[in-house]
């Protein structure tokens, strides 16, 4: 009996076959000199950082988003693309116009500099879920405040990671 497996025919370890699509990126960096980042995005990121009241226990809670998405080698563009799209969700919050302006600048500026092509996947609209029982007014207020604090913690961490990722990319570009 003649037993030949796929990996021996083509000489490719199976791990590479699994990791190959993840490492490839459909983004092209524009503004490779870093000027647009330094002069526009960095300023808005710093302004947003200063606007957010930082709570010391924010850093102890790492959200699942960062466990699933990180700025690892060859994944920088993918991380920044997801992070910029995540920033857009914060525009729906009840925040000041100045805050929205900086948030929009960072989100749109990042997406513009990355120049990513969309994959055209259709998204399923979020379900409304089951009706929740109403709670008393005090509980609702405290839950809203807690949620807002968690959102601001997440935003603060996200901005720091975006900044770190951009710096990593620009260091890599200047070295080559």
Curated annotation (Swiss-Prot):
Compartment annotation: Secreted
- The residues the entry assigns to the signal sequence are 1-25
Family annotation (Gene3D superfamilies): 1.20.1250.50
Gene Ontology cellular-component terms for this entry are:
extracellular space
Quaternary structure per UniProt? Interacts with IL7R and CSF2RG.
Keywords on this record? Cytokine, Disulfide bond, Glycoprotein, Growth factor, Secreted, Signal
Sum up the protein's function in the record's words.
Hematopoietic cytokine that plays an essential role in the development, expansion, and survival of naive and memory T-cells and B-cells thereby regulating the number of mature lymphocytes and maintaining lymphoid homeostasis. Mechanistically, exerts its biological effects through a receptor composed of IL7RA subunit and the cytokine receptor common subunit gamma/CSF2RG.
Protein name stated in the entry: Interleukin-7
Which domain of life, per UniProt?
A: Eukaryota
State the family named in the UniProt similarity comment for this chain: Belongs to the IL-7/IL-9 family.
Output the PROSITE patterns linked to this UniProt entry.
INTERLEUKIN_7_9 (PS00255)
Q: Which Pfam families match?
A: IL7
Molecular function terms from GO: cytokine activity; growth factor activity; interleukin-7 receptor binding
Its GO biological process annotations read: B cell proliferation; bone resorption; extrinsic apoptotic signaling pathway; homeostasis of number of cells within a tissue; immune response; interleukin-7-mediated signaling pathway; negative regulation of apoptotic process; negative regulation of extrinsic apoptotic signaling pathway in absence of ligand
Q: Where is this region: Disordered?
A: 119-142
